[in-house]
């Protein structure tokens, strides 16, 4: 393991590197299958853009980006983290993208989200997490249900998906509910 920040059973999370940005990471965010439910899926990505994002994220005070890596071989298979962090209100948006097609919609997403929630509520002292997804996304609601997120709002016709405007759904997980479920 290289500089682990959080360690699970099969994966660990660490700070992203230039090598990550120059590797497969930038390709994931040009891949239609990987990005079809992401808000910025319409624009192609490049190595230079990924490196610029990495540099921005490292300097940002309201964002934490982590690389998802396999413990067995240190392979970088995804990215996750927190954005729109409000240190005063102790809240953030949470996200996870498994880019490696051999690990999509499987245990990596569950284990990654579990590690993120532990980081948010135990290490960072956050009180509320938000998860936002387009209504046509079938995967995020399943993950949210597993971890106890509750739908708290809906923005009508907000996100363009496949030529149609869809609702954006906002779900919340409060620290006290997470603690009650994980005692």
Predicted regions and their residues:
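A short helix-loop-beta-strand connector motif used in the catalytic cores of GNAT acetyltransferases and
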Residues: 55-67
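Conserved GNAT-fold acetyl-CoA-binding loop/helix
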Residues: 33-53
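Acyl-donor (CoA/ACP) binding surface of acyl/acetyltransferases
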Residues: 1-21, 31, 65, 69-183
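Juxtamembrane/interface motifs at transmembrane-helix termini
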Residues: 43-47, 56-59, 98-99
């Amino acid at each position: 393991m290289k500089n682990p920040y959080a360690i699970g059973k099969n994966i660990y999370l660490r700070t992203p590197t230039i090598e990550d940005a120059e590797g497969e990471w930038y390709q994931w965010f040009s891949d239609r299958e990987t990005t079809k439910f992401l808000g910025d899926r319409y624009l192609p990505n490049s190595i230079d853009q990924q490196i610029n994002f990495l540099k921005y994220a490292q300097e940002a005070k309201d964002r934490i980006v982590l690389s998802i890596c396999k413990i067995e071989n240190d392979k970088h298979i995804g990215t996750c983290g927190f954005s729109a962090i409000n240190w005063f209100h102790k809240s953030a948006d949470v996200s996870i993208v498994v880019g490696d097609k051999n690990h999509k919609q499987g245990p990596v997403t569950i284990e990654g989200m579990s590690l993120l929630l532990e980081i948010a509520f135990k290490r960072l002292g956050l009180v509320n997490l938000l998860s936002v997804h387009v209504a046509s996304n079938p995967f995020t609601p399943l993950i949210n249900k597993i971890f106890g997120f509750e739908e708290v709002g809906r923005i009508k016709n907000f996100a363009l998906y496949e030529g149609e405007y869809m609702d954006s759904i906002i779900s919340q997980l409060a620290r006290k509910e997470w603690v009650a479920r994980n005692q």
